[in-house]
Amino acid sequence: MIQMQSRLDVADNTGAKSVMCIKVLGGSKRRYAGIGDVIKVSIKDAAPRGRVKKGEVYNAVVVRTAKGVRRQDGSLVKFDGNAAVLLNAKLEPIGTRIFGPVTRELRTERFMKIVSLAPEVL
């Protein structure tokens, strides 16, 4: 469960290491984001020669949460931390690699590219 001011790790090779959620997209009173939701993030920590710089604002999709996601069969998939993948204005991934597992809930038409790049889909 991600809300404003939440810190997330970055699960791609854009050069960003840590981001902070500054807005949950999808409605004026929307408070929380879960796996597969698009959020607006600010880069808080970045590698020196990465594609992105500290302080820049991007869209991102949440790929892992400590809260987890409940499946139709009753199982619950949780992770150790929260992670996101940075997106451009067209909601396409900026990076060319994804680190760590992602969930099957991302297998929508919007994020098939992320699922295909991921090393493991849970």
UniProtKB/Swiss-Prot annotation:
Signal sequence residues: none
GO MF: large ribosomal subunit rRNA binding; structural constituent of ribosome
Gene Ontology terms: biological process: translation
InterPro entries found in the cross-reference section: Ribosomal_uL14, Ribosomal_uL14_bac-type, Ribosomal_uL14_CS, Ribosomal_uL14_sf
The keyword Ribosomal protein appears for this protein: yes
GO annotations of cellular component type: cytosolic large ribosomal subunit
Protein's UniProt keywords contain RNA-binding: yes
Cysteine disulfide partners in this protein: none
Keyword line: Ribonucleoprotein, Ribosomal protein, RNA-binding, rRNA-binding
A Pfam family the protein falls into: Ribosomal_L14
Record PROSITE patterns: RIBOSOMAL_L14
Binding partners and assembly: Part of the 50S ribosomal subunit. Forms a cluster with proteins L3 and L19. In the 70S ribosome, L14 and L19 interact and together make contacts with the 16S rRNA in bridges B5 and B8.
Similarity-based family: Belongs to the universal ribosomal protein uL14 family.
Free-text function comment from the UniProt entry: Binds to 23S rRNA. Forms part of two intersubunit bridges in the 70S ribosome.
Name of this protein: Large ribosomal subunit protein uL14
Organism annotation: Leptothrix cholodnii (strain ATCC 51168 / LMG 8142 / SP-6) (Leptothrix discophora (strain SP-6))
